[in-house]
Amino acid sequence: MNKLFNLSPILSAYRLSFTVILACLIISCSTQKSLVYDQELKRMKTTSENRLSAQVDEFNTYPNRPESDGPFNKTNNKSFLLSNIPLFSSSDMTINKVYNYRWWMISKHLKTYHDPQDNKDYWVVTEFFGVKPWASLSGAITCPAGHQFYDVRWLRDEKFLKSYADYFMRGSASHLDQRENGNFLTYMSRPESHHFSSWMVDGIDAFLKIHPDKKWLHEMLPYLEKHQQVWDSLFTVRTSDSKTAGMYKILDLYDGMEFSLSAVLGLINSDGPYSLYTKDNWRNYYLGWETTGNAEKSIQAKNYPKAFRKGYPDFYLVRPSVNSYAYGNLRALSDLYRLNDSSGINKNGQSKADYYASRATKVQQQVMNVLWNKDDQFFNTYSAGDNIFGARDFEARVRESVGYTPWYFNMIPVNDYKNYSKAWEMLASRKGFFNTSGMTTAEQQHPYYNEQAYAWNGRGWPFENSIVYKGYANYLRNYKKSSTLPEKELLYEYVYKLAKMHGDKPNIGEWYIPSTGKEFGGEADYFHSTFPDIIIEDLLGFKGVHENSFSVKPLLPKNKWDYFYLGNLRYHNHDIDIIWKKDWDANKPGEQGKLCVWVDNKLVATSSSLNEQLNVDLNP
């Protein structure tokens, strides 16, 4: 009988060899792909740097532009921008150019200031160039400070915002009263840091999500707390039995939106000194700065001198905006105290993190219960319940863009968000805020809508665009979780219209005409709104957190761009680069779409989906 050969060792060796060969092929294939991705990263980075360099040269030649407020000018701004800003490129050349322009504009507003009050040197960020009568002594103004924090936080060098925060939170601006001059149109004295509404504590929180620094935070927390205490003491409704009791109030002027329609409706429904305003004549007294002189000359102003200041009514409003800012600040205080190693205990034995969380919840509940109108499906404005003159607790039944502010701060209860979602239909409606050239500040179907007057009762205001676009992005990304193509396209259309309004020689001004506008009006190179942050966080979905991780979830419609690159982004002391290409290999059939993320030049994550969330853990 022939003995059968034992083939097992041979087969085992064959299988082992095959496995090794297969593994080598897979590794080789993976290495080749990684090499392709790395080569494309190098190419896009170089292209973006070259484009930025050339465009800064172009921007520096523009005539009739304000001179820089600080040390960065045409002699040195190129090197500063190349070494500091997140690089960005896409297949849309308009948005590319505006992105780079906005950083060039921002560099002109980074100002050094020697404060004679405390003999310290600060970096501040200006809105207008020079020192306006309504500004702090440094020239900085609190009204756009929240937006400035959200944009400037993306610079690699963190010293600018740390110093800016220091100036407003514990420098002279935190306690020096706003100077009273011809532009001081209220009878309430307050520090420079509170002359206009703001959400600076939230802005500092947003900054620390990009550039964490627990030691600096520990030093700053008591001053952030004091900052909020000033808002609590001066700007809350004191009449305990009013509907708006305990809510935050402000003149619309010092909320940055003078001559608002909600104020118009409240004034018309007032008596006493404000019987001056009627449905037929209010435009003669409250429609732009050329009309307040008429009010100043009125019998009512003479009989009630404290009801007006230079013809502007001392009429306080409980607006969705200022209450949302308070919520954002309180929630930020809670988060920052929780992040701090020694969070502190208040006088009642409660942790400060819990204390501020409960206060934020109370503001949230009041906004939902008082300002939300179920019939209008919108957040409306009330007149303050403790107004000395004029209507109290009067609801102005008009939709204004400030009604979207709660979404900016993710203030809507997550489990109940669908009950508030109908408000966003007005963003896409020509009866609401949608117009040919851009977003309006009031609903167009209201009979008092007016986009021509210098008044925020219709005219476009980029400050509000920044609020609403982030609010809408938060609604799609954080509440709905998934979004339809038309929803993404609406956000993109608004961003593109805003970019296009900058013109061939980009410029950002104070206002635009939503129906026919081709360019911005007002002072050129004006820093009161965001754009880099709109691209980085809202559209491309780079989301920073206090933990050592980040996520990317673009809301970019897949059919709009062929590619984008976002890189040179400094985050938690790491360098981040992101590329999405619709087709990585044109020689292969079908789309080879891929989203790639590098950390410190190492490819760490990829996704074949543009719009699914990609999470990256930075922990070793």
Regions found by a protein language model. Name each.
Residues 37-69, 176-199, 206, 232-354, ...:
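The feature captures the catalytic groove of carbohydrate-active enzymes
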Residues 27-28:
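C-terminal motif of bacterial Sec signal peptides marking the signal peptidase cleavage site
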Residues 2-18:
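Bacterial N-terminal signal peptides that target proteins for export
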Residues 38, 47, 51-54, 58, ...:
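Catalytic cores of carbohydrate-active enzymes
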Residues 101, 137-141, 200, 207, ...:
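C-terminal capping/lid segments that line or modulate ligand- or cofactor-binding pockets
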Residues 63-221, 225, 229, 318, ...:
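Substrate-binding groove/exosite segments of carbohydrate-active enzymes
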Residues 346-347, 352-367, 374, 479-487, ...:
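Beta-rich accessory regions
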